[in-house]
Amino acid sequence: MSFTFAIIGRPNVGKSTLFNRLVGQKLALVDDTPGVTRDRREGEGRLGDLEFTLIDTAGLDEGAKGSLTERMQQQTETAIELADALMFVFDARAGLTPNDRAFADFARRANKPVILVANKSEGKAGEIGAMESYALGLGDPVQISAEHGEGLSELYDAFRALMPEPDEEAEEDDDVEGLTEEEFSKRPIRVAIVGRPNAGKSTMINHLLGEERLLTSPEAGTTRDSIAVSVDYKGRQFRIFDTAGLRRRSRIEEKLEKLSVADALRAVRFAEVVVLMLDAQTKFEEQDLRIADLIEREGRALVIAVNKWDLVERHPGQIGALRTEADHWLPQVKGVPIVAVSGLMGEGIDRLMSAIEDSYATWNRRVPTAALNRWFEQAIQTNPPPAVSGRRLKLNYVTQAKARPPSFIVFCSRADAVPESYLRYLVNSLRNYFELPGTPVRIMLREKANPFAHKRKRPS
């Protein structure tokens, strides 16, 4: 693992803004409301030629025993243990508060190098607050504005003084396009876990990790950010994104929840396989179908996990009934894997991880040309394309354009005249023939150029 900095401090001093600035992406939610960050978040940061790991943490605040606030503090303490050095961030405009002083003592007791960061230092008020911080005894403050990108050269100097010299032999380029199929297969599978609020997404990931890495609570909406964690499951690497619960747009009122939903949608777009988690006590609802449709439109492989299976009375045929219901409501991903699980009890985890691996393999599938041609001839022979305006449509040949998801191009005489119903027939036929369950299959129509179109007709 690379050199690791944990960003700590009281709530709303700009820790997540600094995290986003150094990571170069908007990975952490940022809002003026204190306490937006709850789980600890990790990302790969870069500053000049320096590369490092960053851990963004919840604001250090006191909380009652067993409360969500106390568990947020435990997450912060874990981040400090994992870090090689700490960035203690305070709001220079606001000046030092009693909480800043208390948690400066906390940082000192960690017995790790500390970089004192005076954020929001722009303007006279910021300079005065930065000078005040010498009283903390943590050395010279690095004056920055995370929002405006000011002071980063001084922060670079502070990082450079703590970090070891880079190992030139260890430098690698994770360029997906340049990887062989074998190398690509060894990359971590990117998995997003989505669903309605309180479906048990974080509980499931905690069981995979064997620790309470993500905060859980009976209260819906505990998770706000999309949190990424690395999981080694039986020798296979996964990068799993826990996301905020997705509810109907009409029910999304608070600004923070709107930000959380947007964050979850970004996680779906970044993932390769998406696990849609249902609650076994409520099963399919309209919002679940909307989420599944979004996943299909984004071209991601889909697995359905029916969680809290330990809370329902079991009887033969339950999964079969769910399969029938899923195929009825989600024909665009017919045959999607459905796995019954209990995140709390650890039931069905092996089946779920196997389903994710299988779906990933299907999503990456390339069909041999000879087999593709055999399917194409058989599909047209079984159900010839219809006549439109008295003229028979001619489908010439098919080729696979790409995988991830499997996408094909059918060359034909009049692309705009092919009915949508016939295109659906081709998609379903291809999916069944090559066994591509639960992954989007794309077929695009393209007109074959007429080689005689440019020649002038001879006079009779």
Curated annotation (Swiss-Prot):
For GTP 2, which residues are the binding ones? 195-202, 242-246, 307-310
Source organism of this protein record: Rhodopseudomonas palustris (strain BisA53)
HAMAP family according to UniProt: GTPase_Der (MF_00195)
Q: Which residues form the EngA-type G domain?
A: 3-167, 189-364
Family classification: Belongs to the TRAFAC class TrmE-Era-EngA-EngB-Septin-like GTPase superfamily. EngA (Der) GTPase family.
Listed name of the protein? GTPase Der
GO biological process assignments: ribosome biogenesis
Give a short account of what the protein does.
GTPase that plays an essential role in the late steps of ribosome biogenesis.
**Is-annotated flag, keyword Nucleotidyltransferase?**
no
Q: How does it assemble?
A: Associates with the 50S ribosomal subunit.
> So where does GTP 1 get bound?
9-16, 56-60, 119-122
Keywords, ordered alphabetically: GTP-binding, Nucleotide-binding, Repeat, Ribosome biogenesis
Upper taxonomic lineage: Bacteria, Pseudomonadati, Pseudomonadota, Alphaproteobacteria, Hyphomicrobiales
State the gene name recorded for this protein. der
Which InterPro entries does the UniProt record give?
A: G_ENGA (IPR031166), GTP-bd (IPR006073), GTPase_Der (IPR016484), KH_dom-like (IPR032859), KH_dom-like_a/b (IPR015946), P-loop_NTPase (IPR027417), Small_GTP-bd (IPR005225)
GO MF terms here are: GTP binding
Instruction: Identify the residues that the record assigns to the KH-like domain, covering every copy.
Output: 365-449
* Keyword Transmembrane attached: no
Coiled-coil stretches: none
Q: List the Gene3D superfamilies.
A: 3.30.300.20, P-loop containing nucleotide triphosphate hydrolases (3.40.50.300)
